[in-house]
Structures are given as C-alpha cells and as structure tokens.
Design a protein with these regions (language model features):
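Compositionally biased, proline/threonine/alanine/serine-rich low-complexity intrinsically disordered stretches
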Residues: 34-56, 257-291
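Acidic/charged, solvent-exposed loop-and-adjacent secondary-structure segments enriched in E/D, K/R, S/T
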Residues: 131-169
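Edge strands and adjacent loops of beta-rich recognition modules
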Residues: 174-177
Length: 291
C-alpha cells in the first residue's frame, strides 16, 4: 500500500486527481457531491543526501507490508476514503467513499463503491474493463490489458477512473515509493487505530507527506493520511482499511455483473474535454473565390 504510489497518494507525479471519474462523464466518487479536487502539484526531486533521512526500521515496516500484500494471490478489503475540499467559507469540507474491493492476481478486480453521491461499480476480468453507474443505469466497456497494474493505468489514462487505494492492489507495492523516497521515520506504536496494535511510519516521496498505520502482527495497512506538500491549503486525504481477507477463494462470476451487461452503453472515455493546448487544431479556412 506503500506502493510507489503510496495508497494512491504518490501518483501526484503523474498528475492524478483524487475523484474517481467514470467514462460516462459522471463522478463515481466523492466528487459527485461537489468535491472535485485540483490536480496534485508537480513533484519534486529528492534533496541531496536524503538517504541519511531514511530510518531502517521505517523501511522495514513498509517493506514487510508490501511483501505481505504482494504475496496474496487473492484478497478483499474495505476502504473508506475521506477527501477534504475547499468550501466558500474557508474551512474545508470532507467527502467520503466506501469501497468493497476484491481482487485475484494477476488479472481480476472488482470495486463496489458507495459515495457521498451516486454509487459506482468497476469490474476487470483480464480482458475487459467495465465501469457501471447503477443509478443512471449507464455502463462503459473497454478492452483491457492482461494485469491489474496495467488495467489501473489504462482506466486512468482512458477515462480518469482512479482509486486512491490502488497502491495496495499492485504487484509490488514498495517498488515505486523507493524511487522517490526522501525521508522515512518510525513514529511508534498505536493501539487505537484499526482495533489492533499498529506501527506508525511517516515518509515523504514524490512531493507527498504520508503517515501510515500498519498492523504490527499481520503487516496489513489500517490507515493512511497524506498531504501534498505544495498544496497551499494543505488539504488532507485519508484512507481507512478494514475487513482484510487474504488468500480466500473468490466465487465464480465475481468479476462480472449481469445488471451492468444489460445497462445502456456509453463510451469509455475521459469525462472532461481536452484543454485547448491538447485539442486538435481547427482546419484552415479555404479562401472563397472572388465573384
């Protein structure tokens, strides 16, 4: 979950936005309630000598959690995401989503999401990606690459579909974070978060400061909080994890939906129009002949 994206927090280097947008042009997540966030700020390079700020114990905790997640051939969990969004009064408002996640490595994923706004469903079976909005009975379908990691990338680039907790689902959660890691230190233990004893670690990577709580015994993430360091408002992003099940048998048919298959089709495409700089140039006008 620390994946080089650290719970999705570190994807700022790819200018990812927090709201989950569906190809149908409707918000699938908290943004549907008006919590649309600005793109994360540009990332920074690690300062010279940053390696001296990397505490071995903190790295050991992150690596152990990554190894536990990567070794699971199947898993399910619940993720509650809370995103702060500026209000007209000044103090931020909070919008939340609750996602029930099931995956089977290397090529199966299901995310059923409730939100402060319309619910959404996402299915991936190794060949096809399906984004379904039950309230509108609209579905977007697209061919998909053969791995969960590649499918998550494709869903984002093609349709702005993004899960803030995607980093617990990738094949190697620790790999990316290590590339831009600027500092990491061990805070101590907590017996308050997640109903168990957790190790608390703070780290900074790719312009994001993260505090994470990881089960001391089972090595599973329980909560993470992040702030983009160049965000002038220092808005907080939080993910709480619960109901972890690793290695359980996944029911046949879990990665498809008959209701979605029967819904009205819409293009699997980015919901926002391309900015002027990315829009194709208008055709040159043809001078009319003088009569």
């Amino acid at each position: 979950m620390m994946a080089g994206r650290a719970l999705g927090f570190l994807h700022s280097r790819k200018s990812r936005r927090w709201p989950l947008l569906i190809a149908l042009g409707v918000l699938l997540g908290a943004a549907n309630a008006g919590a649309q966030q600005a793109p994360p700020p540009a990332t920074e390079k690690a300062a010279p000598g940053a390696a001296s700020a990397l505490e071995p114990k903190a790295l050991d905790v992150l690596k152990a959690s990554s190894a536990r997640l990567a070794a699971a051939r199947s898993m399910s969990f619940t993720a509650v995401v809370s995103l702060e969004s500026p209000s007209r009064l000044g103090p931020p408002l909070v919008y939340s989503t609750r996602s029930a996640v099931t995956l089977q490595r290397p090529d199966k994923l299901r995310v059923i999401q409730e939100a402060d706004g319309p619910a959404s469903e996402f299915y991936y079976d190794g060949k096809t990606m399906v984004a379904f909005s039950p309230a509108e009975n609209l579905v977007a379908v697209a061919a998909a690459p053969p791995t969960i990691d590649a499918a998550l990338e494709a869903a984002y680039h093609q349709a702005a579909i993004y899960f803030p907790f995607s980093d617990v689902m990738v094949a190697d959660p620790y790999a990316d974070i290590a590339k831009g890691l600027e500092l990491a230190f061990y805070i101590g233990q907590s017996r308050v978060v997640g109903g168990t004893t957790t190790d608390m670690v703070a780290y900074a990577s790719h312009g994001v400061f993260v505090q994470i709580w990881i089960g001391a015994e089972d090595k599973l993430p329980r909560m993470a909080r992040a702030v983009f360091r160049k965000d002038p408002l220092l808005l907080r992003h939080q993910v709480e994890f619960s109901s972890w099940k690793l290695g359980a048998t996944v029911p046949v048919g879990a990665f498809a939906s008959a209701r979605a298959a029967a819904a009205k089709r819409m293009p699997f495409a980015h919901p926002d129009p391309a900015p002027p700089s990315e829009a194709p140039p208008a055709p040159a006008a043809t001078p009319s002949k003088t009569q």
